[in-house]
Design a protein with these regions (language model features):
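"Short basic amphipathic alpha-helical interaction patches in structured regions
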Residues: 14-15, 51-53, 87-93, 110-117
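Signature for the C-terminal beta-barrel architecture of outer-membrane proteins
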Residues: 77-80, 93-95, 101-253
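Beta-barrel outer-membrane channel/assembly domains of diderm bacteria
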Residues: 1-83, 125-129
Length: 254
């Protein structure tokens, strides 16, 4: 991504061009198993490599290099692996991933993070009786690089190393809509041991007359019991999202 801009902030004027590079790297073992890595070598902590070349306050070029690996994980299908080892067809699928992996649930409102852990999914279930066309259930756990503002020390500092997370979420196509329910347990370790709490999530999304898409989301944090201080993860969020449906719903959403 590259952007050209002139910023006039009253006391400061800068014209600049800035860029960001996303690198997705794959090594495929089979059609269903691969190693994946993701890097952003030209930006770090919200600062982009850029050149300031006009304006009263231009300072030249600044390279913001970043050698950190943002994601590195293995993913595959246990059913396909078992089939290959035994040289026999199996009728079940169990996709999984392990490593530093990005996960997104509830449109990023509940979870949007890359942490070190594992996840697996029981896919493609259905029920004619309940009018359910598809159900996917995903179990996940994270043991490092878990970011949450709900786990803080007495001095207010946060951590990504002393927090574990365990959860399950289900995606259900039913009643001509899309349901998403989930549960998570955030487990603080060592100095953050009293910061544990539970998460409950629910969402329903549906299109109406092919004109508007509506989502209703509910997310709750409960059960935290900090010693001698106020809770940092105690409350709920009710969010209503609306968007118009266009002729290109995958690329243009007003």
């Amino acid at each position: 991504r590259t952007a050209l801009a002139f910023n006039d902030n009253g006391t400061k004027e800068i014209g600049q061009i800035a860029t960001r590079l996303n690198l997705d790297l794959d090594y495929r073992f089979t059609a269903t198993e691969r190693l994946h890595a993701f890097m952003r070598p030209l930006d770090r902590n919200g600062n982009f490599s850029r050149c300031e070349f006009f304006g009263n306050d231009e300072t030249g070029c600044d390279s913001v290099l970043n050698a950190n690996i943002e994601a590195f994980f293995f993913e595959g299908d246990l059913g396909a692996i078992v089939s290959g080892i035994n040289d026999n067809y199996v009728s079940w699928d169990l996709p999984f991933s392990i490593g530093l992996m990005p996960l997104l649930f509830q449109n990023g409102v509940w979870v949007e993070d890359a942490f070190t852990g594992l996840a697996f999914t029981i896919p493609a279930m259905n029920s004619k009786t309940l009018d359910i066309t598809n159900v996917d259930i995903t179990f996940f756990a994270g043991f490092d690089d878990v970011s949450t503002s709900g786990v803080v020390a007495v001095d207010g500092s946060s951590t990504e190393d002393d927090v574990n997370i365990y959860g399950v979420t289900a995606f259900v196509d039913a009643m001509q809509g899309y349901w998403e329910v989930g549960y998570g347990y955030t487990d603080g370790q060592d100095a953050f041991d009293d910061s544990d709490y539970h998460n409950f999530t629910f969402a329903f999304t549906k299109r109406y007359r092919n004109k508007i898409s509506n989502s209703i989301r509910f997310i709750s944090n409960v059960g935290q019991n900090l010693v001698g201080r106020s809770e940092t993860a105690d409350g709920y969020l009710l969010l209503i999202e609306n968007s118009l449906i266009t002729s290109k719903p995958s690329t243009f959403i007003p």
